[in-house]
């Protein structure tokens, strides 16, 4: 990582609770967490909830839930505390306004009385497109004109005076970027109603929280000129010690190449994958690998390996595209790499509460389930079928074929994986194998027949077959009576 400051690295993830957490948003959390952990630094969570028109309280907890699920533990922030709180931006309003007063006194801000209608009229008179917006005209408003506006009951907003020249910016992911002079108008930092804007709150909070690095989406790139100007103004009044290093990474696109939006596309909802049983380590891997590759592990790595190898300069500058099949395949890969103990621990939350006998059976079954299942939910369904004392059959097998299989299994000695495999592969007719599969595992888990027979043992395995035979006999008698 180039140009690391002598002070410890402090990164920030600063989401706004305006919708369900999207994959693109959570990807920024993954990168900032990995950067902080890679350098032994601090990962800060700050909730930017100043946009009253869009913020929804019901989306606050999901932001925390998705980070907890993925193991992206924050060192400072809501629920954790820290020396730089509070960590909800609306609770920091007086801090923002105090800094704004200092900026105004230092001449970094100026009062702006222009209404949108007056700006549009000036643009039109100058032969310009009114959609160009504010024209910096209030920089030159005289004190007499300001007094007249106040006498008329008008209240000013406070704008930051941007530099007149070009802005040269060294992006950690993209390299040097030059913004032409005049590419951005002087931004409002405090509205006429006295409320601070994001253009003030973000830089002030970064400064007061000592943020050194921030990786964010490239939708924020056009804001760089005004944000750099704000950081430098804060330096000049002694609020900021340095300008944070910024990296702008490409957005995540849907499979149809449109921008992912969790409010419009369910596939963008990060928590939906948790609810579907995707492993947290898979999602961290997948999101990090959308445009980034590990220097030695390529596209498959654990969270620990991500931390060890993370370098934002390896982020590609073209957008990543969501591929759900790739995600599910990656989940299977990670499932296979779990130890039996890790697999059992991951599977338990997907099952009904287990007593000691069933937990012991699950522990014995873990290697087979891990080898055969493609996901934790699939493994959980197989485990539930293994625990069930009732016959697994949902359809009646061939009675005669099942009875023949029952006789062969009864005579089998010893009851081992080797003897059972030999019997199923060559000692039984195909119809009998099919009948046993129907009775013991049910159609959904037929590929686990041998594993089920070994795990169930002769007593429980034959009991399942006997249950199906008894049910078939009872049905035969009912049919005769009818």
Task: Describe the predicted segments one by one.
Residues 32, 63, 103, 107, ...:
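Residue-level signal for inorganic ion chemistry
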Residues 2-128, 223-230, 237, 241:
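N-terminal Rossmann-like or analogous alpha/beta NTP/dinucleotide-binding catalytic cores
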Residues 11-18, 45-49, 209-215, 267-268, ...:
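Glycine- and acidic
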């Amino acid at each position: 990582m180039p140009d690391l400051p002598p002070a410890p690295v402090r990164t920030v993830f600063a989401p706004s609770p305006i919708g369900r957490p999207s994959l693109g948003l959570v990807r920024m959390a993954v990168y900032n967490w990995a950067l902080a952990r890679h350098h032994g630094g601090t990962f800060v969570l700050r909730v930017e909830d100043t946009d009253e028109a869009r913020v929804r309280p019901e989306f606050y907890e999901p932001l925390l839930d998705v980070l907890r699920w993925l193991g992206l533990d924050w060192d400072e922030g809501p629920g954790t505390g820290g020396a730089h709180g509070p960590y909800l931006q609306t609770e920091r309003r007086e801090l923002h306004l105090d800094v704004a007063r200092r900026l105004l006194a230092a001449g970094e801000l100026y009062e702006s009385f222009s209404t949108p209608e007056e700006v549009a009229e000036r643009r039109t008179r100058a032969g310009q497109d009114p959609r160009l917006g504010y024209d910096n005209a209030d920089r030159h408003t005289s004190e007499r004109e300001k007094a007249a506006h106040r006498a008329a009951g008008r209240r000013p907003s406070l704008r930051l005076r941007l530099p007149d020249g070009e802005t040269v910016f060294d992006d950690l992911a993209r390299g040097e970027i030059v913004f032409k002079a005049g590419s951005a108008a002087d931004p409002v930092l405090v509205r006429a109603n006295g409320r601070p804007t994001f253009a003030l709150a973000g830089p002030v909070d970064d400064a007061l929280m000592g943020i050194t690095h921030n990786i964010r989406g490239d939708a924020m790139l056009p804001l760089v000129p005004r944000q750099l100007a704000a950081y430098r103004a804060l330096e000049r009044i002694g609020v900021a010690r340095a300008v944070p290093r910024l990296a702008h990474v490409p957005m995540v696109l849907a499979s149809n190449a449109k921008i992912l939006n969790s409010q419009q596309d369910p596939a963008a909802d990060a928590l939906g994958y948790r609810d579907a049983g995707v492993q947290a380590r898979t999602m961290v891997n997948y999101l990090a690998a959308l445009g980034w590759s590990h220097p030695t592990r390529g596209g498959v790595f654990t969270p620990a390996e991500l931390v060890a190898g993370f370098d934002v300069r390896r982020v590609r500058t073209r957008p990543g595209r969501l591929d759900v099949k790739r995600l599910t395949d990656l989940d299977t890969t990670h499932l296979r790499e779990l130890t039996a103990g890790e697999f059992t621990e991951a599977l338990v939350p997907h099952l009904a509460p287990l007593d000691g006998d069933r937990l012991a059976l699950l522990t014995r079954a873990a290697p087979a389930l891990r080898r055969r299942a493609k996901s934790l939910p699939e493994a959980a369904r197989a485990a539930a079928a293994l625990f069930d004392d009732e016959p697994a059959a949902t359809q009646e097998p061939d009675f005669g074929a099942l009875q023949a299989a029952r006789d062969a299994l009864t005579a089998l000695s010893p009851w081992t994986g080797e003897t059972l495999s030999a019997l199923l592969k060559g000692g039984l007719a195909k119809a009998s194998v099919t009948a046993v599969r129907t009775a013991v595992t049910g159609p959904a888990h037929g590929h686990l027949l041998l594993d089920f027979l070994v795990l169930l043992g002769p007593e429980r395995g034959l009991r399942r077959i006997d249950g199906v035979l008894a049910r078939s006999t009872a049905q035969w008698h009912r049919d005769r009576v009818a």
